[in-house]
From Swiss-Prot:
Known pathway: Phospholipid metabolism; phosphatidylethanolamine biosynthesis; phosphatidylethanolamine from CDP-diacylglycerol: step 2/2
Cellular localization per UniProt: Cell membrane
Protein's UniProt keywords contain Secreted: no
Cofactor: pyruvate
NCBIfam families referenced in this protein's UniProt entry, alphabetically: PS_decarb
HAMAP family associated with the record: PS_decarb_PSD_B_type1
EC number: 4.1.1.65
Keyword terms: Cell membrane, Decarboxylase, Lipid biosynthesis, Lipid metabolism, Lyase, Membrane, Phospholipid biosynthesis, Phospholipid metabolism, Pyruvate, Zymogen
Annotated source species: Methylobacillus flagellatus (strain ATCC 51484 / DSM 6875 / VKM B-1610 / KT)
Site, as annotated: Cleavage (non-hydrolytic): 247-248
Subunit structure: Heterodimer of a large membrane-associated beta subunit and a small pyruvoyl-containing alpha subunit.
The name this protein goes by in its record: Phosphatidylserine decarboxylase proenzyme
Cofactor binding, note field: Binds 1 pyruvoyl group covalently per subunit.
Lineage: Bacteria, Pseudomonadati, Pseudomonadota, Betaproteobacteria, Nitrosomonadales
Single annotated GO MF: phosphatidylserine decarboxylase activity
Length: 280
């Protein structure tokens, strides 16, 4: 299938430089100009500011402050389910992992080993397991929360490209989520291990976690791993674990032993909300 022009263009533009510039601009505190940009963005993308702890657009000093805004308590009630949806967004794909192959879009798969930065040992944990890929659009709430209780085991920063991660790009860029910059966070609980993979994209200025702070920038040229086995970092189901600046994607991985049953109403492109039931 021929690639659309908008996808072809992504191969040509300097995505990393463009993203670095966007990140700097998003940190600017430019008074009325910042407010004007935020007001346009909120209107253009129909952002529901009534859900925010601070609904006053004029009070945000920078675009990043606005974009990582907190929600009011109770804005996303937690369902009674084993696994909760970790973000607001839209379902890209979900289901079983076929040995080590994760379904991206029609005609495209990628391996768990590639997604996990070549860590074959970690990838074996998820052979024939389960995955869910959720796309966050610019209008969505951009903090990521825990789908279940978990003790942090490790975090790995993986350098990569910065293609857009919207559905159109996912259909036309092979191995998209395994080639973009990403942060792999692995956890464990009484049921076994699971992983949350935060995938970067064009204009996504940075990714951060609650235990580390901003992971990128700086954008390192090599894989870097932090181990937390000797630290008792535990997060409860529904608790914040990280955040994006601008839209991106989260991939959740579970082992075969999880024996998950995804919600009957789940299907690709369906809008989902943080805290709703994802699987039993």
């Amino acid at each position: 299938m021929p690639k659309p022009y908008s996808v072809k263009l992504q191969y040509l533009v300097p995505k990393i430089a463009l993203t670095a510039l966007a990140g700097k601009l998003a940190h600017l505190r430019a008074g009325w100009l910042t407010t004007t940009v935020i007001r346009w963005f909120a209107k253009h993308y129909r952002v529901n500011m009534l859900e925010a702890v601070n609904p006053d657009i004029t009070s945000y000093a920078s675009f990043n402050d606005f974009f990582t805004r907190a929600l009011k308590p109770g804005a996303r009630p937690l369902a009674d389910a084993a696994q909760l949806c970790p973000v607001d967004g839209a379902i890209s794909q979900f289901g079983r992992i076929d040995k080590d192959q994760i379904f991206q879009a029609k005609g495209h798969h990628y391996s768990t080993t590639a997604l996990l930065a070549g860590n074959a040992q970690m990838a074996r944990e998820y052979e024939n397991g389960y995955f869910a890929t959720i796309y966050l659009s610019p209008r969505d709430y951009h903090r990521i929360h825990m789908p279940c209780d978990g003790k942090l085991l490790s975090m790995t920063y993986v350098p990569g490209d910065l293609f857009s991660v919207n559905p159109l790009t996912a259909e036309h860029v092979p191995g998209l989520f395994a080639r973009n910059e990403r942060v792999v966070c692995e956890f464990a609980n009484s049921e076994g291990k699971f992983a949350l993979v935060l995938v970067g994209a064009t204009i996504v200025g940075s990714m951060a976690t609650v235990w580390h702070g901003i992971v990128n920038p700086p954008r390192r040229g090599e894989i870097q791993t932090w181990h937390y086995h000797d630290q008792d970092i535990r997060l409860k189901q529904g608790e914040e674990m990280g955040r994006f600046l601008l839209g991106s994607t989260v991939v959740v991985l579970y082992p075969e032993t999880a024996q998950l049953r995804f919600q009957p109403g789940w299907h690709p492109l369906r809008a989902v909300s943080l805290g709703e039931a994802m699987a039993q």
